[in-house]
A protein has these predicted regions:
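Conserved ATP-binding/catalytic motifs of P-loop helicase motor domains
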Residues: 1-341
């Protein structure tokens, strides 16, 4: 499920700015998660932006924080609910099939109505000796340190030597606060260093073509240090050679504030739930017992990355892990109520 914003064209500057910030992982105007903007389509003078307010919130945004999710802001209401467009609820799921058991479980989870039977079904997917059997699955973690720790263990098991790609940054703002803010945002777009080696499982962090999108997984089969990485992406017919890409931080007026040049890859045996937002993962393993899971919507956001129940492995899930976002749920139900009137 998701919500869609329908906007008349041409868009006013406020709407254009907000859409840019949504699609570029902005902190303040993030609808509910870092990569909330799933797509923007233009059809007969209407732009459609879609996202889910019941997914994981942007970094630092909570029910009590000063900064709020975009749908709780005045500018959101003024721009998308009254002056230039409307918000509607999308029916159906784009990731899970209608006949799969995971779809019903997720629908109950997003509303905070998970049953004991649902939890038992999810925990039953791990099976016996799962710690050894599911190593090749993508393991989702709540914190970056936990994901990196898992990747470090897996990397050490490979015979090839690891290669590190260091970023090159260009900062175009001069004020100390702006520089600090730009560096923080660059870190969310691409890490300062990326470690790869032949045989490593990696994830693409940037969409390069219609057939090779952010979230694509593959295995490294060659590395040219400091220059390129050749990857066999799952489902892609031929190996792809990736070179350094430019990641930009821009302000509301589309002016570039900073750039980071980095290879668009990350080790992907383990990744954070926030990094996985927007990704469709063909094999997902989540051990809820190995680290803290305290944020609203974190469990739902993690489990919903899987396409089907038989592609998912879950361990240690408890009812206390399943937390909904009060404001997101209220907003979503308001849209439902408006549609019934």
């Amino acid at each position: 499920m998701a919500t869609a914003v329908l906007l008349r064209m041409p868009l006013p500057p406020t709407a254009t700015s907000c859409i840019h910030q949504l699609s570029s992982n902005a902190h303040v105007v993030s609808l509910s998660l870092p990569s909330i903007l799933l797509f923007v389509l233009h059809f007969r003078g209407v732009a459609i932006a879609a996202g889910d307010p019941l997914q994981l919130a942007a970094y630092g945004v909570t029910e009590t924080s000063v900064e709020v999710s975009a749908y709780r802001s005045r500018s959101w209401a003024d721009t998308f609910s009254y002056s230039y467009g409307q918000t509607v609820r999308l029916s159906g799921q784009h990731r899970q099939g209608a006949g799969d058991g995971l779809r019903g479980i997720l629908e109950r989870m997003r509303y905070g109505k998970t049953s004991d039977a649902d939890i038992a079904v999810l925990n039953g997917t791990w099976g016996t000796n799962g710690d050894e059997k599911w190593l090749e699955f993508t393991h989702l973690r709540a914190r970056n340190a936990d994901a990196m720790a898992h990747n470090k263990v897996m990397l050490a098991n490979l015979p090839a030597d690891p290669v590190t790609f260091q970023c090159v940054d260009t900062i175009q703002v001069t004020h100390e606060d702006q520089i600090r803010d730009a560096r923080t945002k660059l870190g969310k777009l691409a890490p300062p260093s990326v470690v790869v080696c032949v045989g490593a499982t990696v994830v693409l962090t940037r969409t390069l073509s219609a057939s090779l999108t952010a979230g694509a997984h593959g295995k490294v089969n060659a590395v040219d240090p400091g220059v390129s990485v050749m990857v066999d992406f799952f489902g892609h017919p031929t190996p792809m050679t990736l070179t350094v890409e430019v990641f930009c931080v821009k302000d509301a007026l589309e002016r570039t504030q900073a750039e980071r040049r980095q290879i668009p890859l990350l080790l992907a045996w383990g990744i954070t739930v926030s990094r996985a937002q927007g990704m469709t993962l063909r094999r997902v393993a989540i051990d809820f017992s190995c680290c803290e899971w305290t944020l609203d919507c974190l469990a739902y956001s993690a489990i919903s990355r899987a396409v089907a129940l038989d592609c998912l492995r879950v361990k240690g899930l408890r009812r206390s892990h399943i937390r909904t976002c009060t404001s997101g749920l209220k907003y979503y139900r308001e849209i439902e109520e408006q549609e019934r009137q």
